[in-house]
Amino acid sequence: MKPRTFNRRIVAISSLYRWASEPSRCSVTGVPRNPMPPRSLLHAPKTTRGLSEEQYAALLACISGRRESDPKAQRDYVLIKGSYLLGCRVSEIAAIRWGDIESLDDGGQVHLLGKGGKARTVRISGDTLALFERLGRGENCSFVFPSPRTGGHHTRQAIGDVCRKWGRAAGFHVHPHQLRHSHATHAVQRGVDVFTLQAPLVTRQARLLGMTWPQILW
């Protein structure tokens, strides 16, 4: 159980005992005092905050400006912008194969393999499809972001290194999960309702959302 989940449950239980042990109720509830010990909460790390839209734009501009001098910049640009546009987990973007990216009449769709091996499909705009295809489409079974050392896909650690590298170059801290937070935050700020937002972020089935949201974020 994660610390935040544990803390929420402890607070809920403590609140119930505190309510039941109030002088006006304790004779009825039979709870003379709150039995929960003080300072029983676990330390929880600070919640991840997304990038501002200005920071996100500056990050992409920083990568774009170095495409000629850094041979990996084009791949990194697609990796970072693609992660943001899909709103996916780092493990999902790492494992994408070319066969998972499909072209449709009105854009495309990407099949992702999420937590617990649960598959989901996210609709994308034509611009997002073109972004990935800048890398040069490979065989269906080959990874979009292959590791040059192992022949498999990029690891979580390698993608984290890419984000940190360009974050330092842009002048602020960046890590992969921050892109997922930024995706959700910016979508809500631009008027996407929360229920629509849930589909590409957490749903297990394909959702046909149309092109409104991908075009908003693009």
Q: What positions do the PLM features span?
A:
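N-terminal core-binding DNA-recognition domain of tyrosine recombinases/integrases
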Residues: M1-K46, C62-E68
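Short, polar N-cap/turn motifs at the start of nucleic acid-interacting alpha helices
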Residues: I101-S103, F172-H173, V192-W218
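Short basic/aromatic active-site micro-motif
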Residues: Q74-R75, F172-G191
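Short, charged phosphate-coordinating catalytic segments
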Residues: S24-S27, S83-D106, F195-T196
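Active-site/catalytic core of tyrosine-dependent DNA strand-transfer enzymes
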Residues: S125-H173
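Conserved tyrosine-mediated DNA breakage-rejoining catalytic core shared by Y-recombinases
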Residues: S91, A95-L131
